[in-house]
Structures are given as structure tokens and as C-alpha cells.
């Protein structure tokens, strides 16, 4: 049986979009050097999951487009490294931002875009627009094609989330989660 190594990049954000971009690109390169086939960021890597004690408007203004330069830089890197990358962001959206994951395969192709369905009702996260459901996709990896799905943080508290993904054939469920510590 072939192994697929997944790097859970539980790293602390820098406090700026550009800083997070550079730190994230470096973390992916390090993950590849350590043999990872998939690199997965903690939720909302674009701005860092810093929601507490902040004015909602300040937080909402940090939202970026899911097809913008920040996200696309990780797609190019996925192709360069021949490694899948799950990049997360606070996504601009008309009715309010979304907590989103974009998954690129090892060829740099966007294969899955998923937004957190079960948003939290505390602090500024209540301003998030929930995603429209759980989805799976075929992910081309160095060990072959695997069916992947995703759920973000609080989604995992609902057993139905994983059940839906498993019924869609998910072999791997990626679960980005923000954690206030950095492990190197």
C-alpha cells in the first residue's frame, strides 16, 4: 500500500497578507522537502484566524477574492513542487465573507473550493456567509488519484458533515483548523 503524507501546517500567521504569503510559500517548500504529497493550511490563512475583540468591519475588510493573486500563487507553487496544496482564506463574498478552502492538485489545477457550512455564532464570525454544502473531488497525487472532501473546524462537530463526504466517496477528509500555537 502506498502512503500519502499530509503536512498539517499549524503555523502562526504574520499579521499581514504579504507576510502570510511568503511564510506560507516557505512552509509548503519545507513540507515538500519532508516528503509531503499534500500541504494543508489552518483556516483563514490569508488573514489568520484573529477574530476576538476586533471590530467586525476591520475583519471583513481583510477578505480577499478566491481567484486573486494570493490564492493563485499557491496554485503555481503546487505545480512547481508537484504537490497538492490546500490554501485557506477569508473570501470576499457579496453577502458577507466566507471561510474558504481552495485545493490545488499537484499540477496546479483548482480541484475543490469549499466554504465552511457550520459557521460559529460568536464574535465577528457571525458575519460569515455559510457555504452551500459538502463536496468531494478527485485529487491527482503522486501515489494516484484519491477522492477528497473538506470541512472546516466547527463543521467537524456535526457527524453528518463527514457522513455526507463519505457517501460521496471521500477517502480523505481535509479539516483545516486554526490553532493558537506554532509547531515547527
Annotate each language-model stretch with its function.
Residues 17, 26-107, 111-113, 180-184:
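Cys-nucleophile CN-hydrolase/nitrilase-fold catalytic domain and related Cys-dependent amidase chemistry
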